[in-house]
């Protein structure tokens, strides 16, 4: 289904549709009209020699330098050359496509002053699969994601590089093969492409989408471990969580109740302790807190997706232009720091349940390290080491980037959001989280195979899916293949999809 871009209504799910699943986009006629109206106003101001930042002045520390008419014509090209200053590995194609989509939606408001050809070229690039090559590192998150967005803007000059039909080509060749005209850059055009936190925001949208799916799988893994450990299910009572009132905890407790429905544990046919350890008893409060953190981050990201992140901002009705700081990435970077920490927190609890499954003093009659041949075999002993290493890395990465500002540009840009650092480290946190949760899934399935009572319908289905990918650990074998297979299984969301067919949505 084609995504209509009109400056509003752009959700995280629509970003996924376009960035990951290559849905087509279309600029709404009203948006195109607004872009043309704003451009007409800007050109009148240029003709009148009204001073406008980044149009007929330099940028940053050079904002007081007024450009001649001849310099205005060439300035945007050199602006993009100078700012295409990134380094390192290429950003994923879905990150770049998401950033392009976000920038089109900024332009759709009609406050950016670019020529309509610029916006329409971005639309055409998305629809024909031309994705600029963008270095992942280089942005400090203000004035927007200048370095990565400049590599997108290079395509408007027929320069840079781009992916097209699976190949990395020179920008000019990619555009030619796709049948896209190169629009060039005139006054304001270049800055209108780069002066917003669109890469940060696109990466954050994708992270939140994937993290929500990961959290739902964390609830499935928790339910499996709880059944294997004969947990007391009274702490999952709806009344208990409703009386406190946190939405995330209410949601998480409900999800886990669905997963254990129909099993002996839920029906109280198994003897349990009066009170379990926190890693078993407070799962809804902890995963629920992560849900709430992601919900807040989502609200901030979707505001940014649908707002005018630009500078200067033009108001055609009032014949007005205002220079400000609507490029500042802090409204996204701070909540996204919290979102990354939330995934780490839930990963820590997952590892604690893994410990209880392995530890013969805590695992309620299961064999030590989940092996039948203790001494000769060590079972899942080393699996915990692998999880622990990843936990420590997550903890290091959970230090907030949003407070790490370093002044630049001769102190003109003396506070920046460091939002790209947040975005990059969050995906490292999530990558580790896939592995940690995969190991808990594997251990929980192993533990359940030692139990002879009836499991909840969601738990039973999850174990069936796991056994299609990883066999029961009868005797010791190299586990790195199993760990990797489980990590990929979690990333694929196969367990989640199949379990939700049985128990319904875990949202």
What are the residue ranges of the model-derived segments?
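Catalytic or ion-translocation cores adjacent to nucleophile or general acid/base/metal-coordination motifs
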Residues: 69-84, 356-368
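Short gly/ser-rich anion-binding loops that grip negatively charged ligand groups
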Residues: 65, 85-89, 108-112, 287, ...
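Glycine-rich, flexible loop motifs
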Residues: 2-13, 19-49, 76-131, 226, ...
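C-terminal auxiliary extensions adjacent to catalytic cores
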Residues: 2-23, 27-34, 38-41, 46, ...
């Amino acid at each position: 289904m084609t995504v209509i871009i009109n400056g509003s209504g752009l959700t995280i799910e629509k970003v996924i549709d376009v960035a990951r699943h290559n849905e087509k986009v279309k600029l709404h006629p009203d948006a195109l009209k607004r872009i043309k109206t704003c451009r007409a106003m800007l050109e009148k101001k240029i003709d009148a020699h009204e001073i406008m930042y980044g149009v007929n002045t330099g940028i940053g520390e050079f904002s007081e330098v007024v450009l001649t008419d001849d310099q205005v014509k060439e300035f945007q090209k050199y602006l993009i050359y100078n700012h295409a200053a990134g380094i390192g590995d290429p950003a994923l194609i879905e990150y770049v496509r998401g950033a392009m989509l976000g920038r089109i939606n900024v332009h759709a408001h009609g406050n950016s002053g670019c020529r309509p050809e610029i916006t329409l070229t971005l639309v055409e690039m998305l629809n024909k699969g031309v994705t600029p090559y963008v270095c992942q590192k280089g942005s400090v998150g203000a004035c927007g994601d200048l370095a990565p967005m400049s590599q997108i803007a290079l395509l408007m000059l027929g320069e840079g590089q781009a992916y097209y039909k699976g190949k990395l080509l020179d920008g000019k060749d990619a555009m030619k093969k796709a049948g896209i005209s190169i629009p060039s850059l005139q006054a304001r055009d270049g800055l209108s492409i780069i002066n917003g936190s669109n890469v940060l925001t696109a990466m954050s949208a994708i992270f939140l989408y994937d993290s929500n799916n990961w959290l739902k799988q964390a609830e499935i893994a928790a339910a499996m471990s709880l059944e294997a450990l004969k947990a007391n299910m009274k702490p999952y009572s709806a009344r208990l969580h409703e009386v406190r009132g946190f939405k995330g905890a209410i949601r998480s407790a409900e999800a886990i109740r669905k997963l254990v429905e129909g099993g002996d544990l839920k029906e109280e046919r198994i003897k349990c302790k009066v009170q379990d350890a926190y890693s078993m008893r407070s799962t809804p409060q902890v995963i629920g807190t992560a849900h709430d953190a992601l919900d807040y981050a989502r609200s901030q990201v979707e505001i940014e997706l649908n707002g005018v992140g630009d500078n200067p901002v033009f108001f055609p009705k009032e014949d007005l232009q205002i220079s400000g700081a609507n490029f500042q990435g802090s409204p996204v970077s701070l909540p996204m720091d919290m979102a990354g920490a939330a995934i780490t927190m839930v990963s820590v609890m997952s590892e604690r349940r893994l410990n209880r499954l392995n530890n013969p003093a805590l695992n309620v009659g299961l064999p030590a390290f989940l092996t039948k041949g203790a001494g000769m075999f060590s079972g899942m002993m080393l699996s915990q080491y692998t999880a622990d290493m990843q936990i420590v890395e997550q903890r290091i990465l959970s230090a907030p980037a949003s407070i790490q500002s370093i002044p630049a540009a001769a102190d003109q840009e003396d506070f920046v959001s460091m939002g790209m650092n947040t975005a990059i480290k969050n995906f490292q946190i999530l990558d580790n989280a896939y592995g940690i949760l995969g190991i808990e899934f594997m251990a929980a399935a192993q533990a359940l195979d030692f139990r002879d009572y009836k499991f909840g319908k969601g738990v039973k289905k999850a174990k069936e899916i796991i056994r299609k990918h990883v066999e029961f650990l009868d005797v010791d074998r190299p586990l790195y293949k199993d760990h990797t297979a489980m990590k990929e299984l979690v990333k694929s969301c196969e367990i989640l999809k199949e379990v939700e067919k049985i128990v319904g949505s875990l949202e």
